Amino acid sequence: MPGANYRAGAGAGAGARRPRGARDREEDGGGLEPAAVARDLLRGTSNMSFEELLELQSQVGTKTYKQLVAGNSPKKQASRPPIQNACVADKHRPLEMSAKIRVPFLRQVVPISKKVARDPRFDDLSGEYNPEVFDKTYQFLNDIRAKEKELVKKQLKKHLSGEEHEKLQQLLQRMEQQEMAQQERKQQQELHLALKQERRAQAQQGHRPYFLKKSEQRQLALAEKFKELKRSKKLENFLSRKRRRNAGKDRRHLPLSKE
């Protein structure tokens, strides 16, 4: 009969899409078992088309399908013993590892925190440098330096010659240079403060404040230095040293005399 032939043909097509064992289990059990389907379908996947393979993947699941294509059954995968991670009974005992495993180049050791050096001059925790506040805070150091200078002078009187005399002389000279540099720095701070007060007064009067150039500030500082040297009667010595220094510089630029 035509109807019977059609049903037979449909049944044959369904059998080509799915193996007989899987269809029988589906009809008997009412559902698909991934392990049983995988065992039955392992032999028939090579003859299936791409659409049939996609349908099979949707029926058994992606994981089981990949194991099926790779040739590993879920039973074999489940029969493998789980790999246990290396562990130790006591945390203070060294770790036991297999001698067959190659030791990595970069071993995992206990991390040690890096010691970071802190320079208070460039650290934000110390705040911004303010010369006025610094001088007021460490003003007691000037008294200590003055006492040390007097002590060096007394020691210098005891040692009139020899190596100790040269060391004390160099120390006294370095202390005097530091004192002169400190006085010069203090004069510059006073000059900046005076200019700042003058600009503030101009702004209060309604005038536009005038900011001096660095060259003009250096000229004002040099004029104050000359006034201070003149008051202390050291201007002539300063000018003579300045002339000798300039003469030496000019002599280096002169052409050499030919014999």
From Swiss-Prot:
InterPro entries: RRP36 (IPR009292). GO terms for cellular component: 90S preribosome; nucleolus; nucleoplasm. It is found in: Nucleus, Nucleolus. Residues 240-259 have a biased composition (Basic residues). Transmembrane segments: none annotated. A motif (Nuclear localization signal) lies at residues 241-244. Its main location: nucleus. The modification Phosphoserine is found at residue 73. Residues 1-38, 233-259 are annotated as: Disordered. Keywords: Coiled coil, Nucleus, Phosphoprotein, Ribosome biogenesis, rRNA processing. Residues 157-205 form a coiled coil. GO terms for molecular function: RNA binding. Pfam families: RRP36 (PF06102). GO terms for biological process: maturation of SSU-rRNA from tricistronic rRNA transcript (SSU-rRNA, 5.8S rRNA, LSU-rRNA); ribosomal small subunit biogenesis; rRNA processing. Belongs to the RRP36 family. Meningioma antigen. Involved in the early processing steps of the pre-rRNA in the maturation pathway leading to the 18S rRNA. This is Ribosomal RNA processing protein 36 homolog. The lineage of its organism: Eukaryota, Metazoa, Chordata, Craniata, Vertebrata. The gene is RRP36.
